[in-house]
Amino acid sequence: VLLIDLDPQSNATRGSGIDSASLKSSVNDVLLDRASIKETIVLSEHDGYDLLPATPALTESEVSLVSKNDREFILKNILKAISSDYDYILMD
């Protein structure tokens, strides 16, 4: 199971016990093509799910993506790289 935190308040990230300040990259970086999804996913050994974390910087991608063509397909195309790795992908 993969949980994708798409909220700039990072509630799913914080609720998973992850300090967003300690992250090298987040879903924002993936959406803006500054990091790969595979290197950004935080693997869980105990909780039964992996996490694509968010930070407050996610508001940056909201502003940047609004003017992009085919923006509604960006996340879909990103998920192609990992879709076979997970039975379920949940988005918050």
PLM feature spans:
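P-loop NTP-binding core
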Residues: 1-91
